[in-house]
Regions:
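A structural signal for small-residue-enriched, beta-sheet-centric alpha/beta enzyme cores
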Residues: 1-73
Length: 73
């Protein structure tokens, strides 16, 4: 495959990881001021699930891309 495409995939994974973490930080702050604490907890639980699944996936993709690009250098 194309090295440029592979690089784009790695960049996308890294950006997705950062976006998930940044969005969760905002959620953690904003749920503290919510009156509906049960709903706030539902949002926090969902955020934790998404972080658990997708941050590790993004790391795996990024690591695999880095390894492949380094081998081709």
């Amino acid at each position: 495959g194309s090295r440029m495409l592979l690089s784009d995939v790695g960049c996308g994974a890294a950006l997705a990881r950062g976006s998930l973490i940044a969005a969760s930080h905002t959620l953690f702050v904003n749920t503290r001021s919510m009156y509906d604490t049960a709903y706030a907890q539902t949002l926090l639980d969902e955020a934790d699930k998404l972080l658990d699944i997708y941050v590790s996936r993004a790391d795996a993709v990024s690591d695999a891309v880095s390894a492949q690009l380094r081998q081709e250098a």
